[in-house]
UniProtKB/Swiss-Prot annotation:
Source species of the chain: Trichormus variabilis (strain ATCC 29413 / PCC 7937)
Lineage, broadest ranks: Bacteria, Bacillati, Cyanobacteriota, Cyanophyceae, Nostocales
Transmembrane region(s): 6-26, 36-56, 91-111, 115-135, 136-156, 169-189, 212-232, 243-263, 277-297, 314-334, 335-355, 375-397, 417-437, 464-484
Entry membrane topology: Multi-pass membrane protein
GO molecular function terms attached to this record: NADH dehydrogenase (ubiquinone) activity; ubiquinone binding
Family: Belongs to the complex I subunit 4 family.
UniProt name for this protein: NAD(P)H-quinone oxidoreductase chain 4 1
E.C. number: 7.1.1.-
Length: 525
């Protein structure tokens, strides 16, 4: 059967969205039918993603594949244009995997199940669209549409301060989206031909000052979603009030949208401006790693502690992105996927712990490991993955960023030594706050008041299955990272070469900018 011309990406995007529209008419009294329906739809869509990937995707091809383009507004060159390359394909697979598991994690949800699973499936298709669309205006639209399900998931099913957290989320992200719209319209109408096609936009000859302005606009929008300090404060509040499945989607997928867009738009379309902004990004990445790690250490609320840990880990993505090496950029992509798996697992376990203890304050926990040995073991394993234990995906990703940046010829030796030292400090801080967290939850003397009022039952099979599904790729990638890196190596090599080609212009026009040896080989070639 020839599947090369089948509209895989359109089908994968529209299937969960169309399925969500049927939820209001499905007969169901107690929510059980709806949740099984949502799970089956998620599994079918994920199976289609995997099948399309294995039958129609070529690892060695760095360009867009599975390309589809259907006219929408021909006068403005607006098209339903989708495609996948090495940058987007791993994140599409991650989206299908995490969202399907989040559907299973949502099993205990009983409040308005029809609306909940409607939002979950609609969000599923929308998130895949963000990683697949190749039309900039269409990208803006699906980026904006993603805000609605997340807002409602926070505002309806969140904790006591859910309205505050949801409002803060929508204000931050919608405000950032204005910069995307302004930049998109400006780029589209620049020059003689009007177009929103990303590939055509990348070929336009923008003046350097114009590139810098566009880059800054995109950076603000994507820095909010990644997030980059100081535009991060919405995330701890959102995580502090979210339910377990919303946690998994926030940590596992939503943050990756910011990292993906930063690489796709800022580096892919505006490489000359990237050469100017790269040193600033490195500094911001270091601030993310150190500041968020120290803040996480000080948190007494379990959800907020893990939220700041996520911000810290995103610092490695930023530094790898700005390294000008194949290895660093490859590590940044690997870190996004790795953190998606690890972050989803930790927040799921935080939810499982809260369901039993009914508290998030570490001061009110203690000694529960004896009563919940399975949750204790799973929490420990996922925490080890988060602190980058060798043999797990986080170790490989952070090591690649370390080596990629350290071997970069785009920065002075002094600057590299300082940055690598501070990155190492962040790596040391991570086990300090994670191991202390485990000690306060599971070790020590039991909180007698907690034990007397709560039934501390251990993990049920559904919870063990979700964590097992997440740990398998975490460990698999840790021992054999080529499982993942082979998907995108060709794309990252091509993108890094384009970024390095832009640096001679920088060196000529601005001598004080980071030095680059034009004759030096690109790392990984």
């Amino acid at each position: 059967m020839n599947t090369a011309n089948f509209p895989w990406l359109t089908t994968i995007i529209l299937l969960p969205i169309a399925a969500s529209l049927l939820i209001p008419i499905i007969p169901d009294k107690d929510g059980k039918t709806i949740r099984w329906y949502a799970l089956i739809v998620g599994l079918i869509d994920f199976a289609l993603i995997v099948y399309a990937f294995y039958t129609s995707y070529d690892f060695a091809n760095p360009d867009l594949q599975l390309v589809e383009s259907y006219p929408w507004v021909p006068q403005l060159d607006l098209n339903w244009s989708v495609g996948a390359d090495g940058l987007s394909m791993p994140l599409i697979i991650l989206t299908g995997f995490i969202t399907t598991l989040a559907t299973l994690a949502a099993w205990p949800v009983t409040l308005k199940p029809r609306l909940f699973y409607f939002l979950l499936l609609a969000m599923y298709g929308g998130q895949i669209a963000v990683f697949a669309v190749q039309d900039l205006l269409l990208f803006f639209l699906v980026w904006e549409l993603e805000l609605i399900p997340v807002y409602l998931l926070l505002a309806i099913w969140g904790g006591k301060k859910r309205q505050y957290a949801a409002t803060k989320f929508i204000l931050y992200t919608a405000g950032g989206s204005l910069f995307i719209l302004l930049a998109a319209l400006t780029m589209a109408f620049y020059g003689d031909n009007v177009t929103f096609d990303m590939r055509s936009l990348a070929l336009k000859d923008y003046a350097l000052n114009f590139q810098l302005l566009l880059y800054a606009g995109f950076l603000i929008a994507y820095a909010i979603k990644l997030p980059i300090i100081p535009l991060h404060t919405w995330l701890p509040d959102a995580h502090g009030e979210a339910t377990a499945p919303a946690h998994m989607l926030l940590a596992g997928i939503l943050l990756k949208m910011g990292g993906y867009a930063l690489i796709r738009m800022n580096a892919g379309i505006l490489p000359d401006a990237h050469a100017y902004f790269a040193p600033v990004l490195v500094v911001l990445g270091v601030v993310n790693i150190i500041y968020a790690a120290l803040t996480s250490f000080a948190q007494r609320n379990l959800k907020r502690k893990i939220a700041y840990s996520s911000i810290s880990h995103m610092g490695f993505v930023i530094i790898g992105f700005a390294s000008f090496t194949d290895l660093g950029l490859s590590g940044a992509v690997l870190q996004m996927v790795s953190h998606g798996l690890i972050g989803a697992s930790l927040f799921f376990l935080v939810g499982a712990t809260y369901d039993r203890t009914h508290t998030l304050m570490l001061d009110e926990m203690g000694g529960v490991g004896k009563r919940m040995p399975k949750i204790f073991a799973m929490f420990t394993a996922c925490s080890m993955a988060s602190l980058a234990l060798p043999g797990m995906s986080g170790f490989v990703a952070e090591l690649m960023v370390f080596v990629g940046f350290a071997t970069s010829d785009a920065y002075s030796s002094t600057f590299k030594v300082i940055v690598v030292f501070l990155m190492a400090v962040g790596v040391i801080l991570t086990p300090i706050y994670l191991l202390s967290m485990l000690r306060e939850i599971f070790y020590g003397k039991e909180n007698e008041e907690l034990v007397s009022h709560q039934q501390l039952i251990d993990a049920e099979p559904r919870e063990v299955f979700v964590i097992a599904c997440l740990l398998v790729p975490i460990i698999g990638i840790g021992f054999y990272p080529k499982l993942l890196t082979q998907m995108y190596d060709a794309t990252t090599v091509q993108l890094t070469a384009r970024l390095r080609d832009s640096v001679p212009t920088l060196a000529q026009e601005k001598p004080e900018a980071p030095k680059v040896s034009l004759s030096a080989p690109v790392i990984g070639n």
